[in-house]
């Protein structure tokens, strides 16, 4: 994977009530990371890092179109292009190792200090794909994935990752013993990055990449996972249910906590019920199984 000639930084002033939803939206647009610069008087200043120049002012209009109920301050305060040689420097302070759950640890590829020996390390480098473990929805998805796998009497043989992004969820599954990861994404730029991250972690033999979303996959798996926003999850409900093998588990993250009911109602039509959930900072992840299997 080649590095971009420049990367872009955008700073937004966001009403505190919108901050989590806006951050999740930014990751869906392809930011490699976000950090809070300042919090005061009910507002946050958020800096976003991108590997390709974007028309950031258009994001705000798109956000309000997708979330008409989201009311509050949202302004682009500053944006600039930075030379690629500063890319890694800009990330050193922001993207630090983070422990997730009981066994996982996400670390940037350049990190040189000693890491805990009792953790399964997933090495990543910033890219255009969503998923570095820095956003709470990714962290919750990883925690739920770990919980489900560790509770099984036997490690499931395969997993389908819908909307794979950086491949971080599939990588975690491979680290936890799953031998076949089918990863799909409708952005063709993303799959080479996910494949690169699998190779970086010596897990390339476990990766099967598919361009497109859930509808293009014609097999099932005992474990299916998707970290997407509610609208995307709801549009994929039929296929998410279809891909989940009989007796299997579907994990969904990327939801605000109050969005549980719409997704649960949609999946209940296919016999899937919530069997586990986890929540942090206003976001939630859920595991679904057939009624009677929990």
What are the roles of these predicted feature ranges?
Residues 9, 13, 105, 123-125, ...:
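Conserved beta-strand segments that form the floor/walls of ligand-binding pockets within enzyme
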Residues 128, 132-217:
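Conserved SAM/SAH cofactor-binding pocket of Class I
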Residues 4-116:
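N-terminal auxiliary segments of SAM/dcSAM-dependent transferases
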Residues 85-153:
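SAM-dependent Rossmann-like transferase core, predominantly class I methyltransferases
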Residues 186-294:
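S-adenosylmethionine
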């Amino acid at each position: 994977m080649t590095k971009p000639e420049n990367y872009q930084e955008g700073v937004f002033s966001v009403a505190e009530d919108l901050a989590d939803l806006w951050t999740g939206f930014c990751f869906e647009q392809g930011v490699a990371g976000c950090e809070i610069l300042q919090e005061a008087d009910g507002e946050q200043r958020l800096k976003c890092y991108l590997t390709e120049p974007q028309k950031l002012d258009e994001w705000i209009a798109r956000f309000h179109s997708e979330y008409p109920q989201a009311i509050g301050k949202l302004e682009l305060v500053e944006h600039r292009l930075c030379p690629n040689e500063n890319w890694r420097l800009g990330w050193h302070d922001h993207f630090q190792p983070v422990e997730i759950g009981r066994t996982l640890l996400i670390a940037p590829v350049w990190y040189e200090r000693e890491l805990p020996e009792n953790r399964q390390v997933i090495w990543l480098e910033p890219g255009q794909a969503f998923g570095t473990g820095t956003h709470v929805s990714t962290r919750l998805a990883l925690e739920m994935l770990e919980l489900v796998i560790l509770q099984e009497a036997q490690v499931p043989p395969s997993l389908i990752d819908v909307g794979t992004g950086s491949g971080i969820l599939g990588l975690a599954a491979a680290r936890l013993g799953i031998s076949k990861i089918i990863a799909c994404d409708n952005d063709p730029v993303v799959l080479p990055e996910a494949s690169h991250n699998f190779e970086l972690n010596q897990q390339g033999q476990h990766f099967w990449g598919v361009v497109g979303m859930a509808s293009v996959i014609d097999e099932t798996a005992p474990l299916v996972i998707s970290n997407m926003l509610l609208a995307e999850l709801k549009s994929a409900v039929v296929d998410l249910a279809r891909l989940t093998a009989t007796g299997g588990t579907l994990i969904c993250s990327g939801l605000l906590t109050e969005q549980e009911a719409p997704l649960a109602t949609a999946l209940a039509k296919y016999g899937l019920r919530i069997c586990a959930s986890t929540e942090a900072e206003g976001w939630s992840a859920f595991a679904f199984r057939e009624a009677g299997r929990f």
